[in-house]
Amino acid sequence: MAVILLLALALVLGCYCALHRHKLADIYLRPLLKNTLLEDFYHAELIQPEAPKRRRRGIWDIPGPKRIPFLGTKWIFLLFFRRYKMTKLHEVYADLNRQYGDIVLEVMPSNVPIVHLYNRDDLEKVLKYPSKYPFRPPTEIIVMYRQSRPDRYASVGIVNEQGPMWQRLRSSLTSSITSPRVLQNFLPALNAVCDDFIELLRARRDPDTLVVPNFEELANLMGLEAVCTLMLGRRMGFLAIDTKQPQKISQLAAAVKQLFISQRDSYYGLGLWKYFPTKTYRDFARAEDLIYDVISEIIDHELEELKKSAACEDDEAAGLRSIFLNILELKDLDIRDKKSAIIDFIAAGIETLANTLLFVLSSVTGDPGAMPRILSEFCEYRDTNILQDALTNATYTKACIQESYRLRPTAFCLARILEEDMELSGYSLNAGTVVLCQNMIACHKDSNFQGAKQFTPERWIDPATENFTVNVDNASIVVPFGVGRRSCPGKRFVEMEVVLLLAKMVLAFDVSFVKPLETEFEFLLAPKTPLSLRLSDRVF
């Protein structure tokens, strides 16, 4: 009986040892040996159990929607599954963040993985990487189309080029448009653009309801006029009240919108356009052709006018043409690159400027205290131009615009290609991995900004100096125009023009939206259209 009990005890002890070797060592052996010299127990040493080696987690270990052969994770957008709408992709990515965490894997039908980053530390690590030539994934449909048209394009353009060629285009083509000194020369002309826009709004609103229907169409015309004033150096007359615009001009904004939608569908769809000309590809080609034809015609007309008036042009007119002339006079670039760059700048500026204005207006009209404070900063400029000093001192207005950028940037996420191996959120990613930095979603988190879903311009005002500042906690993830060398070259122009437009509209009208603004994804974030605004004349 005693033998059986001893065997049973040994069996229990053996099982316990097998399952909890480290507990046995810590609880039983260490107390027995702690006061005993090594030589007293035949130099025996306690053998530590080896910690199991942790497997290195790679890209395919990242959580995300289930992958299906030949579809990847794109099945979530297909009609017969219809979990999500592609027009609400910004909301889709927010939902994936809630489901899977701060790092999510998306897989293309070609089995190419794309990693979505939501963690602030990961975003900063990727976007602040010191690179001479930051790499971002090219928009393949643009690359494919432009390579098929060597008669028009010598390269795939500044946005889609990479490496030294990108650097060459960037440094040559953007030096003027990014210069604060050059942009200040345009302030009087841009004031005039804003004034004409205000008069056009007055002419187009319903006299009884004071509602301007299809406001976005007029905003696009304003964007076209403002960008052409900058790039070509003279007013084009697109905001004239009594002049009927040519049909091609009215089609231009629609073509720009279609261009972005086709890019979205080509990037997030199944990619069949790569193998035969699908509707997505045909729509893109038509839009690209129309944009090129219309703006190219404007440029050619300006070149002829320039030749005629070069001898008698005054200094002011020559100053306004500085950007246009600087690009045309570049000797080391193909004329096709010069022309396509001007076309790209104008096309991108139309929708970006109009959408940014609408997002800012939506934010400030939703805050009852915002409009009076903006008005107080510009009330002395009712009958005069708003020049640089006024822009510099517009603390609250700039804070409102910055807060709108945080909540609804037109570029809500930024794409990069990793240039070296990185560990992000505990996963090891190899160089060459495509990552999407989900900055807007990160900006909506209370862990990054207190009251993150609320419109709070005051967060961008230094309480000590009462000046506008971007030196606040986590401001580095608010990047509506990109960051670093790959940032949008039109950033300064858009910021200056939006301040002017907001000031002029608040001086002229009490603005309200007939219906709350909704957003859609069109490769950039855009307002859902049509939009109607109620504009009541402001009485002082």
From Swiss-Prot:
Required for CNS development; midline glial cells. Involved in the metabolism of insect hormones; responsible for all ecdysone 20-monooxygenase activity during embryonic, larval and adult stages. May be involved in the breakdown of synthetic insecticides. Its main location: mitochondrion. Its EC number is 1.14.99.22. It is an enzyme of class 1 (oxidoreductase). Its cofactor is heme. The lineage of its organism: Eukaryota, Metazoa, Ecdysozoa, Arthropoda, Hexapoda. It comes from Drosophila melanogaster. This is Ecdysone 20-monooxygenase. It catalyses: ecdysone + AH2 + O2 = 20-hydroxyecdysone + A + H2O. It holds the Pfam family p450. The keyword Acetylation does not apply. One of its GO terms (cellular component) is mitochondrion. The keyword Metal-binding applies. GO terms for molecular function: ecdysone 20-monooxygenase activity; heme binding; iron ion binding. Strong expression by embryonic stage 10 in epidermis, decreases significantly in older embryos. Third instar larvae show expression in the midgut copper cells, Malpighian tubules and fat body. In the adult ovaries, expression is seen in both nurse cells and centripetally migrating follicle cells. Heme binds at C488. Pathway: Steroid biosynthesis; ecdysteroid biosynthesis. It is found in: Mitochondrion membrane.
